Structure formats: C-alpha cells, structure tokens
C-alpha cells in the first residue's frame, strides 16, 4: 500500500473525516472496484464470507435458510450462498423485502407470518436445510432448530428480536445438530486471516457475483448521522446506509 492508494478498512469509530486503522485491517482496492461499492459491501460482505466459508462451508446443492434475508447481511448471505451453488430460502417481514431478496438470488422467500416449518419442509421434500443463518434470535430459534436436516448446522450471529431463551442442549442430540454462536472478529485475528477472507470478498465483487445494496446516503453531519441511525433502528431499510464526507473546500 502506497500514499494515494484507495483502501477500505475494518475499523470502529468511523463517523469521522480521518481515522487511524491498523495495517492488518486495511485492504488496497483493485482499480475495478470503486470506494462506494467497497464501503457498502465490506462489513456485511466479510460477515457473509466467513459465515459461508468458515462457520459452515457451503457445498454446491446445500439447502440454506437465511433469516432476515433482506437486511444488509442477509442480502450478502443470499448472494454468496448462490455463488457457491446453494439453494437459498430466505425469511423477511414484508412482500417488498421479499422481492428484493429474490432479485438478488433467493430461490424462495417466506414471510415471518407464514408457516415457516411447513414451507421449508415442502421446498426440501421433507429433508430440511443443511444450515440456518439466524440473526434474529429469540423469535426464530425454535423454528431454526426444527427445519434443520440431519447433521445440520445452526449459526446464530445476531439477536435482533432479543436474546434467545436458554437452549437445552439435549435438543441438539436427535439430529446431531451443530450449534455455533458466531463472532466475525474471531475469524479475523491475524493479518493472514483478514487477507484471506477479504480476498474472497474482493473476487466476488469484481466478478459481479455479489453486489452491494445501498439504501441511502447521508452527509457526515449531526443531522445526517442522526437520520441514518433513526432509519436503521426503524427496521424499514434494506441494505446499507452510507455516510458521505462532504468535499473539502480545495476539492469542491
């Protein structure tokens, strides 16, 4: 990396014009990839890549269930899973969000009010799914366990509906279910790990197998950041909300 290169970094406290990032979490962007796409894709993209390549390695032909399939991470998961050859089933709250998930590759999208277990069994001919990616938590965990196939994997990586009730581990025994509580940074401890997974994500983006989904852009200001936070918490958005830094006077 040289001065003047365009880079993307995984760093906190980034509502700022300048940030300090560790070298181990900075990636040089290829010329084919613009900064807007990289920023929109990076955090959720890395989450999706590690979920599908490490937490559970998706194989061609797998049946995959993605809860909250129209959210930022959900849309990335749908696309990465499809790129790996999976049959993707998503869940979401509205028909509008369902259409968005289908546009980006979901084979079937169910609404939370539907009979999720019955529909999944119908789609999978009663076999269940190989893996469930669950970022919802409390309101979906029981369904997630029920729709899994024999030797299936349940990856919990969020709790948007609240923390699940304590899980009696004996419920995992009948189908030999593998259960994981996922944390992204657990797969990015070293520079080698970060470069490995970021390289996979860059390849997916440059090859157009994965597309960043931008909901809206906001200026870096007190009002802009407040509006973005309020819309994010409303759970009415799909995809990413970006904060844009206004150009400096000499750049305007």
What function would you assign to each model-found segment?
Residues 70, 74, 78:
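N-terminal Rossmann NAD(P)H-binding glycine-rich loop of SDR-like oxidoreductase domains
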Residues 150-155, 167-212, 236:
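Rossmann-fold dehydrogenase core element
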Residues 14-17, 92-100, 164-169:
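Short, glycine/polar-rich helix-capping loops at beta-to-alpha or helix-loop-helix junctions
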Residues 192-252:
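C-terminal hydrophobic helical "lid"/dimerization subdomain
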């Amino acid at each position: 990396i040289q001065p003047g290169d365009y880079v993307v970094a995984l760093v906190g406290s980034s509502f700022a014009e300048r940030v300090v990032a560790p070298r181990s979490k900075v990636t040089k962007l290829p010329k084919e990839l613009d900064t807007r796409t990289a920023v929109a894709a990076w955090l959720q993209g890395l989450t999706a890549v590690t979920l599908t390549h490490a937490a559970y390695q998706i194989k061609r032909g797998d049946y995959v269930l993605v809860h909250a399939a129209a959210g930022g991470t959900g849309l990335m998961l749908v696309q990465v899973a499809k790129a790996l050859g999976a049959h993707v089933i998503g869940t979401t709250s509205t028909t509008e969000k369902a259409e968005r998930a289908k546009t980006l590759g979901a084979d079937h999208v169910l609404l939370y009010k539907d009979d999720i277990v019955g529909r999944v069994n119908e789609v999978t001919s009663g076999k269940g799914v190989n893996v469930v990616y669950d970022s919802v938590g409390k309101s979906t965990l029981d369904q997630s366990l029920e729709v899994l196939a024999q030797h299936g994997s349940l990856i919990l990586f969020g709790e948007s509906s609240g923390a699940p009730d304590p899980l009696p581990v004996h419920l995992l025994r009948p189908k030999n279910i593998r259960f994981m509580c996922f944390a992204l940074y657990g797969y990015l401890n070293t520079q080698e790990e970060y470069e490995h997974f970021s390289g996979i994500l860059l390849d997916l983006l440059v090859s157009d197998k994965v597309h960043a989904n931008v909901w809206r852009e906001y200026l870096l200001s007190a009002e802009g950041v407040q509006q973005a936070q309020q819309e994010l918490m409303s759970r009415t958005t799909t995809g990413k909300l970006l904060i844009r830094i206004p150009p400096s006077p000499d750049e305007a």
